[in-house]
Amino acid sequence: MNKGNLIKNYAVALFNNAIVDNIQDKIFEEITSINRIITDNFDIREFLFSPIVNKNDKINAVNSLAKNIKISTIVQNFLLLLVKNSRTAILSNIVDAYNTLLYESKNIKIVQVISANKLQPKEQEWIKSRIEKELNQKTEILFDIDNTIIGGIVIKYDSMLQDYSIKGSLEKITKALKTVNIAV
């Protein structure tokens, strides 16, 4: 099984368990919080991801963590499953996949907007409203910065890519010039 399918299967399993008790949002908050703790703490991350550390020690650590931060049994059991199957290293990917499932269940499209500089709140609101109008759907916009695009924005959702960046325009011009054999 490829990694993408594996990640999606774990996310779907967790999501389906959350649906049973109608706690999808709560589970997302918990799993995101756990992921942040693991990501932000080098020692915890190395301990849980290390193939050298005994699984029973990892299980005890997860149980202790769950007790200290008071997470649901669903999330605790899910983390234990990841430990037992040596899959803790893909937790961040599973959280992202779960997030996608959560938004899809609410008919909200996740859209990534990349700009060369940090956008002001009014600019973000304007972009969000334009995208929602174009898609005729509610969106969750993830604003990222990539100064290599020079200026403009790049919009990504599903398998779509709309490149309104200066870098993208320059690449198109370069490609067009090459097709007519003009040296660039």
UniProtKB/Swiss-Prot annotation:
The GO terms this record gives for MF are:
proton-transporting ATP synthase activity, rotational mechanism
As for membrane topology, the entry says: Peripheral membrane protein
Which organism was this protein described from? Rickettsia rickettsii (strain Sheila Smith)
Alphabetically list the UniProt keywords. ATP synthesis, Cell inner membrane, Cell membrane, CF(1), Hydrogen ion transport, Ion transport, Membrane, Transport
User: What is the protein's quaternary organization?
Assistant: F-type ATPases have 2 components, F(1) - the catalytic core - and F(0) - the membrane proton channel. F(1) has five subunits: alpha(3), beta(3), gamma(1), delta(1), epsilon(1). F(0) has three main subunits: a(1), b(2) and c(10-14). The alpha and beta chains form an alternating ring which encloses part of the gamma chain. F(1) is attached to F(0) by a central stalk formed by the gamma and epsilon chains, while a peripheral stalk is formed by the delta and b chains.
> What's the superkingdom here?
Bacteria
Query: What parts of the sequence cross the membrane?
Result: none
Under the heading NCBIfam families, the entry gives: ATP_synt_delta
Q: What name appears for this protein in its UniProt entry?
A: ATP synthase subunit delta
Where is this protein chiefly located? membrane
Q: Which family, according to the similarity comment?
A: Belongs to the ATPase delta chain family.
Enumerate the subcellular locations listed in this protein's record, separating them with semicolons.
Cell inner membrane
Q: What does this protein do?
A: F(1)F(0) ATP synthase produces ATP from ADP in the presence of a proton or sodium gradient. F-type ATPases consist of two structural domains, F(1) containing the extramembraneous catalytic core and F(0) containing the membrane proton channel, linked together by a central stalk and a peripheral stalk. During catalysis, ATP synthesis in the catalytic domain of F(1) is coupled via a rotary mechanism of the central stalk subunits to proton translocation.
Q: Name one GO cellular component term.
A: proton-transporting ATP synthase complex
UniProt cross-references to InterPro entries, sorted A to Z: ATP_synth_OSCP/delta_N_sf, ATPase_OSCP/dsu
Read off the SUPFAM superfamilies from this record. N-terminal domain of the delta subunit of the F1F0-ATP synthase
Q: Taxonomic classification, please?
A: Bacteria, Pseudomonadati, Pseudomonadota, Alphaproteobacteria, Rickettsiales
